[in-house]
Amino acid sequence: MPVKKKRKSPGVAAAVAEDGGLKKCKISSYCRSQPPARLISGEEHFSSKKCLAWFYEYAGPDEVVGPEGMEKFCEDIGVEPENIIMLVLAWKLEAESMGFFTKEEWLKGMTSLQCDCTEKLQNKFDFLRSQLNDISSFKNIYRYAFDFARDKDQRSLDIDTAKSMLALLLGRTWPLFSVFYQYLEQSKYRVMNKDQWYNVLEFSRTVHADLSNYDEDGAWPVLLDEFVEWQKVRQTS
């Protein structure tokens, strides 16, 4: 989860590198190297008091974990801010804004996860990753990401933020992602609205990589109609 300092587009969730003239996205690994989490005894029950004290290790005077606290939190748990596991955690906490956890979000979410310390959260990493492999949970995470990443005074995602979040969520699994990314790079679109965002996931799940089953008369957004047309021209040229 990129740390936002001024509510602009997020830090690059997937770095983009030049390769043979074509831009390809590199997705961060799920977890950087870290010491193994300490095994937690079943007798060590969840403590709301301990969870609150843990929150204050990172919160500022406004009782919010902001950019600086978030960086320290990520360092302590051994996860890069851009790592997709941070997006899953934010979803579990029902966090409203990227790069920020309120006290209410922290206590409600960590109570749900039964985590009141770093080690317990690290022991939940496999569970958090597993949510990405569940079709229903992934859909919920994907939809959550739209409102989570957008500036709250805007109805749509700016296109750079959309590309970064799509890279994080679909870059590893959608065969057409790199092509779609190239399309967005050269397109006229400067924002992506919620309907377009939702339909990109549906498109990635239902349309074949060769576009052979794409229904031109279907209720797809114009953005995707234009993408298909653009790609077919490239394939025949």
Swiss-Prot record:
The keyword Lipid metabolism does not apply. Keywords: Cytoplasm, Cytoskeleton, Nucleus, Phosphoprotein. Residues 46-232 form the DCUN1 domain. Pfam families: Cullin_binding. The modification Phosphoserine is found at S9, S41, S48. Induction: Expression is decreased in a time-dependent manner after UVC exposure. Phosphorylation at Ser-41 is independent of cullin's interaction. Phosphorylated in response to both TICAM1 and MYD88 dependent Toll-like receptor (TLR) pathway activation. Phosphorylated in response to IL1B stimulation. It is found in: Nucleus; Cytoplasm, Cytoskeleton, Spindle. One of its GO terms (molecular function) is ubiquitin conjugating enzyme binding. It comes from the Eukaryota. Gene3D superfamilies: Cullin, PONY binding domain, EF-hand. GO terms for cellular component: cytoplasm; nucleus; spindle; ubiquitin ligase complex. Changing D195A: Loss of interaction with CUL1, CUL2, CUL3, CUL4A, CUL5, CAND1 and RBX1. Does not affect localization at nucleus. Weakly expressed in testis, skin and immune tissues (thymus, spleen and lymph nodes). Changing A219R: Loss of interaction with RBX1, CUL1 and CAND1. Loss of interaction with CUL1, CUL2, CUL3, CUL4A, CUL5, CAND1 and RBX1. Does not affect localization at nucleus. GO terms for biological process: DNA damage response; positive regulation of protein neddylation; protein neddylation; regulation of cell growth; regulation of protein neddylation. Contributes to the neddylation of all cullins by transferring NEDD8 from N-terminally acetylated NEDD8-conjugating E2s enzyme to different cullin C-terminal domain-RBX complexes which is necessary for the activation of cullin-RING E3 ubiquitin ligases (CRLs). May play a role in DNA damage response and may participate in cell proliferation and anchorage-independent cell growth. The DCUN1 domain, also known as PONY domain, mediates the interaction with different cullins. The DCUN1 domain mediates the interaction with the N-terminally acetylated NEDD8-conjugating E2s enzyme leading to the NEDD8 transfer from N-terminally acetylated NEDD8-conjugating E2s enzyme to different cullin C-terminal domain-RBX complexes; the neddylation efficiency correlates with the DCUN1D5-cullin and DCUN1D5-E2 interaction affinities. Part of a complex that contains DCUN1D5, CUL1 and RBX1; this interaction is bridged by CUL1. Interacts (via the DCUN1 domain) with the unneddylated cullins: interacts with CUL1, CUL2, CUL3, CUL4A, CUL4B and CUL5; these interactions promote the cullin neddylation and the identity of the cullin dictates the affinity of the interaction. Interacts (via DCUN1 domain) with UBE2M (N-terminally acetylated form) and probably with UBE2F (N-terminally acetylated form). This is DCN1-like protein 5. It comes from Homo sapiens. The lineage of its organism: Eukaryota, Metazoa, Chordata, Craniata, Vertebrata.
